[in-house]
Curated annotation (Swiss-Prot):
Major location (coarse): cytoplasm
Enzyme class: transferase
Gene name of the encoded protein: metK
Keyword annotations: ATP-binding, Cytoplasm, Magnesium, Metal-binding, Nucleotide-binding, One-carbon metabolism, Plasmid, Potassium, Transferase
Positions with a binding annotation for K(+): 45
Cofactor dependency: Mg(2+); K(+)
Record-listed E.C. numbers: 2.5.1.6
Name of the molecule in the record: S-adenosylmethionine synthase
Note describing how the cofactor binds: Binds 2 divalent ions per subunit. Binds 1 potassium ion per subunit.
InterPro entries per UniProt: ADOMET_SYNTHASE_CS (IPR022631), S-AdoMet_synt_C (IPR022630), S-AdoMet_synt_central (IPR022629), S-AdoMet_synt_N (IPR022628), S-AdoMet_synthetase (IPR002133), S-AdoMet_synthetase_sfam (IPR022636)
Similarity comment: Belongs to the AdoMet synthase family.
Subcellular location: Cytoplasm
Binding sites annotated in the UniProt record for L-methionine: 58, 106, 246, 277
Protein's organism: Ruegeria pomeroyi (strain ATCC 700808 / DSM 15171 / DSS-3) (Silicibacter pomeroyi)
Amino acid sequence: MSRQNYIFTSESVSEGHPDKVCDRISDAVLDAFLTEEPEARVACETFATTNRVVIGGEVGLSDQAKLREYMGRIDQIARDCIKDIGYEQDKFHHETVEITNLLHEQSAHIAQGVNAAEGKDEGAGDQGIMFGYATTETPALMPAPIQYSHAILRRLAEVRKNGTEPALGPDAKSQLSVIYRDGMPVGVSSLVLSTQHLDPDLTSADIRAIVEPYIREVLPEGWLSADTVWHVNPTGKFVIGGPDGDAGLTGRKIIVDTYGGAAPHGGGAFSGKDPTKVDRSAAYAARYLAKNVVAAGLADKCTIQLSYAIGVSKPLSIYADTHGTGDIAPAAIEKAIDTVMDLTPRGIRTHLGLNKPIYERTAAYGHFGREPEADGGFSWERTDLAEALKKAV
């Protein structure tokens, strides 16, 4: 029997966090190539530090002239990302930061294992394990600690960028310790919020006065009480932020990107990777499947694991765990999953429409628990497979 009464903690980071700056640039590069060619191959990594951004990795287009043209756009893509995030500080400014582009063409040896040949479906871009998770504890079928940690930072970014709160800077982190009773979230025992601020004379109390109304706005009513412990900018001043304060790298916030530690993680990052890479596409598929299992009423919680081998199209294994919250045997759910969805790399991309420039928007505030969008963004958050799963079990 799983625990019913406990405290669980998750954190999030803002779009201005150094690692998220890098995720954003990597996904913006990916979107640029997918705009030109839906089958483009991209593995883009970004490093950011004081006054410098380095972009490297592998890319591939069928048209070599177009490939050279797009290579020339990388500098401006990175600057546009930094500008939109809001960095205009002396040692990290979108106009003056030095951009180094080390991207090159994808290895033919990798391509031969992934590309479809006559009579053979394309293989997975790498080996690996991917997890998906869903739970009834929030309307988005996400764990509450990570979902509301994201919501706090997203709201603070909105009021910073629209000019309502000009004292706030782009770099911020949140952390919520959520109280569970009978397995459901009911309150917050402690809250941590650290945000960069542009006025060096602001105190922690000043910052709390700015952010507290927005935090109360996004959290469910009654979750904050007199017993909730607040830590707002607990170290004091936070003026130097972003890549000038700490170096950033693509792919270092994989728990923030997923379930906040409430579910297993296979270890593969998402940003900068085109959807032939199962680190990304199969993790999206696993979330889609888990969410649809829960949306179908087959369980209150569901964890899905998929595994792949490089160059092999079909998953090596499908695993489901409903954590004792459903009446359907996990083995029956596994069989149903294999029946209702093609889990080859191409099958996933086709089913979820992943060969589109829909990735830059995923780079901050979580890849999961978002609303599906009209242009195909966050398609893995749809629940259109629920009825098929119910029939298949």
